[in-house]
Each structure stands twice: as structure tokens, then as C-alpha cells.
């Protein structure tokens, strides 16, 4: 995911900024939704202090690049973006996961590759970034600067937003270096989370996407301590948080969608909330593999057989539930039999939405020391075979929806939908899942507006997507 300050320009434009000599900051956000929320915090602070944003590197007094350093492609994209910003502007501050990554000899990788950057920080370092900005572009003094809205500055479209509930992770998966960059789990105070959620709903957000490194573990680090919100006690615990978010969303007719949910036993407690319509019947669960030996080498906290049992329980409790997951093919030591076991799991589990990565060694990951590294061609071939099975399952599930009526959140609607539009059902998270292609309404009076809901009858499928007739 790549976002620039353009996405926030309507919230940040100062009108006659040039005439008042307000400094402008260029901004690029790379990586996952968790990095996006870090970017939003920085942009919110910039706005609070009176800075404006620039739509180009050349037009900025300084550029901030929020980087990703998880896989090699992300590292390359981040380094290339830093280089581009340096070439066009020359004054660059780097933050994010790549900023915490070591290079040769243990030195900072960003400093080694781009020694002229002004400052480098790791992830979730808003204050450090602002301190660096103040050094190189002093804070403007303007008593007439607009106040920042309660929900902060967002890089997403106005009708959906990400809500980060914690930072870091207590797991030590052998293929992952996130804990070394973002640290152990730190849960946000539940009152702060709920206040942010309420402000987002009040601002017009119709879909709230709950994110973290491990949503199921929310509150573990503080022993599920009791917090207070609206004068009432509430535990810092995933199930309590989800229940309150559902209550907040209901009067606004908004959706709550859960991401990065590890399949712990207490996840079963939120299924009745899904079945009752309090939160979306959608779970993003990172299974990664199904064979117990591979999961053991990955140091994952589950096994395939238990996951099949969980999926069966979830579907019994909430038949309409949609499960999304990600998997890794070609992990070191993975035999053909272990990979076939994974394919059998996919066929039996019937995961609605599945993505798969060919294993890619990440510098600093303990998996690099495992025996049995597979050639790239084998890894890619297994990824392709996995996706063929996953796409067949997905296509079958999509066909089952033809003839059904679904609620669709509209993401695009040229000419108020007179030529059709595009939206998503409860089964579709933004950017990672499919969409619903909306046909032109049959009623002349029917209008489609971005950020609003419409009912649609599903009339067909198109690849990973559905085709719907607005009602």
C-alpha cells in the first residue's frame, strides 16, 4: 500500500499557505495498514502545529518517507522512494520499519544506502519525527490555523478508516522480523481506542477496520486490566472491545471489520456478535500453513487440525461468516507431501479469500538458518499451485452468491451511479479482497453516492468479483 499526502489534501489545505509563508511537508506512506496509522498520527500532529502539505517533492520544504522493511521487495521500494525524494528535494526524514533495519556491519541500512537523509527513526515514532521536523523546518506560528478534527488526519477515503488497537507482537515466528522492529505487544488504553472510534463514526466513517499485529492478544500485556470509558468500567480485552465497538457502530449504521485475528479459543466468543449483526461476520486469520511440522518450524501458535475444527465451529455459530487468510508456500524444509497437505487443507477448509506468498528470506529472520531451503522456481511453482486451488474455492463460493441480495458500501460512483459504480459487501475488505461491480440503476431516480450503502441483487461473477444490480 502506497499513500501520499494528496489523500489528506482536503483536510490539510491551508488556502493561502504560500502568502502566509507556511512551511510545506511532502509525505509518502508505504507498507501495511499499521504503517498507515502511524502516518496518520504524524500528519495529524503536523496539521495541529500548522504545517501544510505538498503534493510534490519539489514543492515541499522537507519530505517524510514512512517505510516498510518486511520483505525484500518492500525494502527496495522504500529505498527507491527515499532516493527519488532526495533527488527531487534533497531534504528527507525517514521513519518506519526500514528505519530500524540494520545493514552491513550492524549499521543503519538507510544511513548506509542514503547517507544524506536528515534523520532516521523506527516505527511508531511520531514524537521523534516531529522533533526532526522542528530542527530542519521550524514550527510555524499562526494563531489562525484551523483546529485538527477529533478523528485526526486520515489517508483513507472518508467513509472507511483503520483503527490500530495495539503495537508490537509477542510471537516470534521464524519467518518474521516485525517484533525486532516494532517490539513486544503494547495495547492501547481501551478508553483511547473507543474515543477514537466514536470520533471516526461521528465524522462519517461507515467502515472501521480493526488492525494490530495480533488483535486476539489485545490486553494480554496489561493482564486485561479494567479501564474506564464514558464513566463505566470495561476490560482491556478483545471480546469486550469488539462488543463496545459494535455498540458504537450501530446508531451510525456502520460496519466493524476485524483483521489479524489469531485463532485462539476466546475468538469463539465474538461469533454470537457476528451472527447477531453487531460486527461484520468476517475474520482475517493468518493461518500461514496447515501441516504441523511446517507450523512448528514457523513457530506458529496453532496446528492445521485444530484450525479445521475451529472453522467448523465458527460456521456452525455463524453460517454467513467469511474467512480470509494468508499462507506461505515453499518454506524451508517443506516437502511435497507437506505441501499437498496444505492443498488438502484448503480444499476442506474452503477459505473464502486466500492469498499466498512464495517464501522469501528476510534478513534477520531465524528461518534463514533452517535446513532445506528450496529453489526459487520450486517456491514460485508451489505458490501458483496453491493459488489455483484457492481461486477455484473462491470462484465456487462467489457463484453461490448469485441471486442473493447484499448490502454494498459504495467506493466509486461516477455521475451519481448513472453509469454504474463499484463497492464492497461485508465479504470484501478494501484493497485486499474483491469488489462488487454495480450496474447502472434500473430506476431513473436511483442515485449512488460514495460512502453510502445500497442494496444490490447479485447477478453474476467476474473473476474475483461480483456483479450487482442496485435495488
UniProtKB/Swiss-Prot annotation:
Its cofactor is [4Fe-4S] cluster. Coiled coil: none annotated. Binds 2 [4Fe-4S] clusters. One cluster is coordinated with 3 cysteines and an exchangeable S-adenosyl-L-methionine. Keywords: 4Fe-4S, Cytoplasm, Iron, Iron-sulfur, Metal-binding, S-adenosyl-L-methionine, Transferase. Transmembrane segments: none annotated. It comes from the Bacteria. Residues 155-396 form the Radical SAM core domain. It is an enzyme of class 2 (transferase). [4Fe-4S] cluster 1 binds at residues 32, 68, 97. Residues 399-471 form the TRAM domain. The keyword Secreted does not apply. NCBIfam families: 30S ribosomal protein S12 methylthiotransferase RimO, MiaB/RimO family radical SAM methylthiotransferase. Catalyzes the methylthiolation of an aspartic acid residue of ribosomal protein uS12. Belongs to the methylthiotransferase family. RimO subfamily. This is Ribosomal protein uS12 methylthiotransferase RimO. It comes from Methylibium petroleiphilum (strain ATCC BAA-1232 / LMG 22953 / PM1).
Amino acid at each position: 500500500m502506497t499513500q501520499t499526502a494528496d489523500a489528506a489534501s482536503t483536510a490539510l489545505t491551508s488556502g493561502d499557505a504560500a502568502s502566509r509563508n507556511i512551511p510545506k511537508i511532502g509525505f509518502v506512506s508505504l507498507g501495511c495498514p499499521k504503517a498507515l496509522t502511524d502516518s496518520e498520527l504524524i500528519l495529524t500532529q503536523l496539521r495541529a502545529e500548522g504545517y501544510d502539505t505538498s503534493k510534490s517533492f519539489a514543492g515541499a520544504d522537507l519530505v517524510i518517507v514512512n517505510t516498510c522493511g518486511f520483505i525484500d521487495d518492500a525494502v527496495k521500494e522504500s529505498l527507491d522512494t527515499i532516493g527519488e525524494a532526495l533527488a527531487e528535494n534533497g531534504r528527507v526524514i525517514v521513519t518506519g520499519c526500514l528505519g530500524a533495519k540494520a545493514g552491513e556491519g550492524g549499521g543503519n541500512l538507510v544511513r548506509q544506502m542514503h547517507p544524506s537523509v536528515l534523520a532516521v527513526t523506527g516505527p511508531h515514532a511520531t514524537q521523534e519525527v516531529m522533533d526532526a521536523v522542528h530542527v530542519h523546518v521550524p514550527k510555524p506560528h499562526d494563531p489562525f490555523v484551523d483546529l485538527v478534527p477529533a478523528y485526526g488526519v486520515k489517508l483513507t477515503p472518508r467513509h472507511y478508516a483503520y483503527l490500530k488497537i495495539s503495537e508490537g507482537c509477542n510471537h516470534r515466528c521464524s519467518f518474521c522480523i516485525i517484533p525486532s522492529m516494532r517490539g513486544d505487544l503494547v495495547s492501547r488504553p481501551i478508553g483511547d481506542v473507543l474515543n477514537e472510534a466514536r470520533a471516526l463514526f461521528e465524522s462519517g466513517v461507515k467502515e472501521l477496520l480493526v488492525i494490530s499485529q495480533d488483535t486476539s492478544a489485545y490486553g494480554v500485556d496489561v493482564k486485561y486490566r479494567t479501564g474506564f470509558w464514558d464513566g463505566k468500567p470495561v476490560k482491556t480485552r478483545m471480546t469486550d472491545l469488539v462488543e463496545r465497538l459494535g455498540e458504537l457502530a450501530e446508531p451510525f449504521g456502520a460496519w466493524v471489520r476485524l483483521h489479524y485475528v489469531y485463532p485462539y479459543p476466546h475468538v469463539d466468543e465474538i461469533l454470537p456478535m457476528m451472527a447477531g449483526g453487531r460486527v461484520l461476520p468476517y475474520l482475517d486469520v493468518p493461518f500461514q500453513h496447515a501441516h504441523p511440522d511446517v507450523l512448528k518450524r514457523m513457530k506458529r501458535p496453532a496446528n492445521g487440525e485444530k484450525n479445521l475444527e475451529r472453522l467448523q465451529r465458527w460456521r456452525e455459530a455463524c453460517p454467513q461468516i467469511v474467512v480470509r487468510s494468508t499462507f506461505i508456500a515453499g518454506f524451508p524444509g517443506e516437502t511435497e507431501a507437506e505441501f499437498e497437505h496444505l492443498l488438502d487443507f484448503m480444499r476442506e477448509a474452503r477459505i473464502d479469500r486466500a492469498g499466498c506468498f512464495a517464501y522469501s528470506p528476510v534478513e534477520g529472520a531465524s528461518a534463514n538458518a533452517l535446513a532445506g531451503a528450496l529453489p526459487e522456481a520450486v517456491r514460485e511453482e508451489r505458490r501458483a499451485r496453491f493459488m489455483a486451488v484457492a481461486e477455484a474455492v473462491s470462484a465456487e463460493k462467489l457463484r453461490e452468491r448469485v441471486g442473493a441480495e447484499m448490502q454494498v458500501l459504495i467506493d466509486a460512483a461516477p455521475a451519481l451511479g448513472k453509469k454504474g459504480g463499484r463497492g464492497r459487501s461485508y465479504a470484501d475488505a478494501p484493497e485486499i479482497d474483491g469488489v462488487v461491480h454495480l450496474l447502472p440503476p434500473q430506476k431513473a431516480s436511483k442515485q449512488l453516492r460514495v460512502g453510502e450503502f445500497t442494496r444490490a441483487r447479485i447477478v453474476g461473477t467476474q473473476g474475483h468479483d461480483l456483479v450487482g444490480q442496485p435495488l
